[in-house]
């Protein structure tokens, strides 16, 4: 294992030796030093000891410190050599980096590159690296540099610790403070951002690996399950959304702000709620919010799948359509035979569309509207509805196109629209589009002839989709799906 200390060196004038040394303490370790970098370096050498030595000291020097004749480095080199000799420590290898005359951010880029290359050179011989950061020295703008450096090195997976020398000029005493927590807070911020931007809880689990709070542990478990549900497009997303809401509330109520720095995750809870549209009564709007979140974060395949898995439930549970089961229950239950219970609401809607199909083509006055005589009179009434409902595998895919013509005049008795028929037509058209788009994404192939006919019919009915026929891109699918979500929300708003 290799230990590397990185310091931004503060200028130290010879006349300060006359002012006397400071006594710095950290728990059971006490060191005497005139200069803050000296204090941190002596503390770290003492803490590591002779057996677990400090191997390399990377020293970032400003122009003032590096100027010929300056006393700073002369003093530090001599004092550390003396200190190591007296205590049986090995003097670390020095690697000096000079800020130079570059414009501020250019020199930061150069210095970061030099330090990164040196650390990688050391890691080539021994990848087990621990980085120690001396936060006590340098000019004020070096804090920005240290933050950038910490972020850069953390991506390599190194263990990082930070220290600050806090002195009382009146009493000539000071404390060596471990400032690891500030970087842990940054890890939490990054982890929460990873969750709200990409739906991943892996970084959160790592950031809170040592937290003992039952509420936080339960929240992390729920966030991981929620993340899995999004990634796998699971059907239990509504349940996971409700559980996440409950666990966020538990942390808000029962976790002390100051316990183990957990205030940071509490501070991020409003962001989590906002990004995922989480509220105590999310329901269908919560699912719509998650689909929208997927679209906003480039998860188009997940958005299409989650939408398709939930659209029937939203339409039925939100009562956009009402079905009198006394009238239609027997037929629907027969269609449900051998189907999974989760398909119940989808089956109800397919049944309604099938009856609309029947009513449309039993009407002698209905125009064909062309398009190959309305798709070959719906493929000869879908082979007479596959022998009049005799086979449960009849082609739902073909007759759901009836949704495009969905009009209250075709509704069977006992079925009622609770939103305007034009809006309902759009919602069914959206759902048809989402199926076509998902099939194309999942199968990684071009849409087939029948889907082309469907999209052409959409366009004839003045409801064009950006993604078809020749512009099937994530950007255009996202645009079409956002419009689909807007239509659903309009329907929910009009119903309330």
Task: Enumerate the language-model features and the residues they cover.
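Hydrophobic/aromatic interaction determinants used to assemble and anchor large protein complexes
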Residues: 137-139
